[in-house]
Amino acid sequence: MKIGFIGLGNMGASLAKAVLQAKTGAQILLANRSQAKVDAFIADFGGQASSNEEIFAEADVIFLGVKPAQFSELLSQYQTILKKRESLLLISMAAGLTLEKLASLLPSQHRIIRMMPNTPASIGQGVISYALSSNCRAEDSELFCQLLTKAGLLVELGEGLIDAATGLAGCGPAFVYLFIEALADAGVQTGLPRETALKMAAQTVVGAGQLVLESQQHPGVLKDQVCSPGGSTIAGVASLEAHAFRGTVMDAVTKAYKRTKKLGK
C-alpha cells in the first residue's frame, strides 16, 4: 500500500509522523511546496520524497494537508489523473470543507474522509474527529484508525458534528495554552520563577485532565473536592465566576465553531 501526504504543515507533518510510527508497512510518500521541509521531515522520521502528481497517480490513500482556499485549485490541476484512477481514499483535514463540497471537486468514484485533528497529535495525545462519505467502504474506518492509532483519541462522528468538534478540540489547545500562560503569569506575579511557574501550570492542566479521564467523575465533583469551606481555592473559583470564566470559554468555542462553518462556504 502507498500512502501519500500532500502538505507538511504542522498538522500534515504530525499525522505523517503518526502513520510512520504505526509501522503498517505501507510506503509513505511526502510532498510539500517547500522541498526543504520534506527533506527535514525524512531526516527526522523517514518516508520518501515525492510530488503531488506522483501521489495522485500512485497512492492508495491520500492525506490532503492544504488550506481550504487551496483545495479547488489543487484538485483541478490533477483532474485528468483522478478521473483515470480507480476508487481512492482521500482524507481532508481542511476546516469547514464539507463532504459534499469535497465530493464536488472529485470524480465520483473516490471515497472521502473528512477529519479534524489537533496539534497534540504531534506527541500522540491528539483528538481526531472524522466523518466518512456515503460511498466509503466498511474497512475504510478501520484502516483510518489503524493508520492513526499513534496520534491520539479517534472519534467518528456524523458530519453535522465535525464543525462543533473543530471549535472544541481543534481550536481548544490554543484556549488551553492561554490558560496555562495565565496560570504561569500569576505564579510569577506571586513570586515563582518563570520556568518553575510554567512547568507547574502545564503539569497542573495535564494532571487535572488525566484525573477527569481516569476517575470518570464529573469535573464539578472534582472541583468541589478541592474547594474546602472558606479556603483558598473557593476564593479563586469565586473570582473566576465573577468574571464569567465559564461563559467566556463557551463563547470562545461557539465563535470558533461559527467561524469554521464560514470557512466552508
Regions flagged by a language model, labelled:
Residues 1, 26, 47, 88, ...:
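A structural micro-motif
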Residues 1-57, 125-126, 188-189:
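NAD(P)+-binding Rossmann beta1-loop-alpha1 motif at the extreme N-terminus of oxidoreductases
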Residues 15, 45, 52-130, 134:
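Rossmann-like NAD(P)(H) cofactor-binding subdomain of soluble oxidoreductases
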Residues 28, 38, 71, 193-200, ...:
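Small-residue helix-packing motif on alpha-helices
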Residues 101, 105-111, 127-165, 177-214:
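Internal alpha-helical scaffold of NAD(P)-dependent oxidoreductase catalytic cores
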Residues 166-174, 223:
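A short glycine-threonine-serine/GTX helix/turn-capping micro-motif
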Residues 202-265:
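NAD(P)-dependent Rossmann-like dehydrogenase/reductase catalytic/cofactor-binding core
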